[in-house]
Amino acid sequence: MSNSAVEDARLTDLALAAGRGDRAALEAFVRATQRDVWRFLAHLATPSSADDLAQETYLRALRSLPRFEGRSSARTWLLAIARRVAVDQVRYERARPVSPVDASAVERPQRGRFEEIVELNVMLDGLDPERREALLLTQVLGLSYQETAEVCGCPIGTVRSRVARAREDLLGDRLRRSEEIG
């Protein structure tokens, strides 16, 4: 069994125990998953909203833990909840009336960040949202294509296609940027 499969089994056991009321298991489950949940939400939404969205994800998960049966891995289950939280937030923001932007409220990037990290984030942000999501789940968070399909609610072939197209898009963007510089 791979390290990832062992870790997923451990997380699932923790979630099942937490669902039965084991507070120590709940604490261990949250600690073990919070980094992946935050990173996933930061890429789906924005880093500034990731804390609030992660909190909402865990609130929803806590309410649902007693009904979690372990048919999928707990990590897949939790990331599917995070995905729904992000989608709900986008729907909420689109439904709100647009008001003039206060320049002081605009999130300013931190100075001193490495150019490559900034460039990568710009390139990721330029991807189609479904392609970005599939790429992040498989390449950054390390989910299998099957697990990613479960999180996204689509066939595994669609996930493979989205990841392949995301890679092509990133490579094409990188080549264009190189040609502009050189």
Q: Predicted regions span which residues?
A:
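Arg/Lys-rich amphipathic alpha helix in sigma70-family domain 2
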Residues: 63-70, 80-101, 113, 165
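DNA-recognition helix of helix-turn-helix
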Residues: 83, 87, 140, 152-177
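Helix-turn-helix DNA-binding module
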Residues: 125-133, 141-158
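Structural recognition of an alpha-helix C-terminal capping motif at a helix-to-coil junction
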Residues: 52-59, 72-84
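Amphipathic, Lys/Arg- and hydrophobic-enriched alpha-helical face
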Residues: 30-48, 64, 124, 176
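Short, charged helix-capping/linker segments at alpha-helix termini
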Residues: 2-4, 19-28, 38-56
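C-terminal edge and immediately downstream basic/flexible tail or linker adjoining helix-turn-helix-like DNA-binding
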Residues: 2-5, 17, 45, 122, ...
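Internal acidic/polar
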Residues: 4-11, 88, 94-122, 144
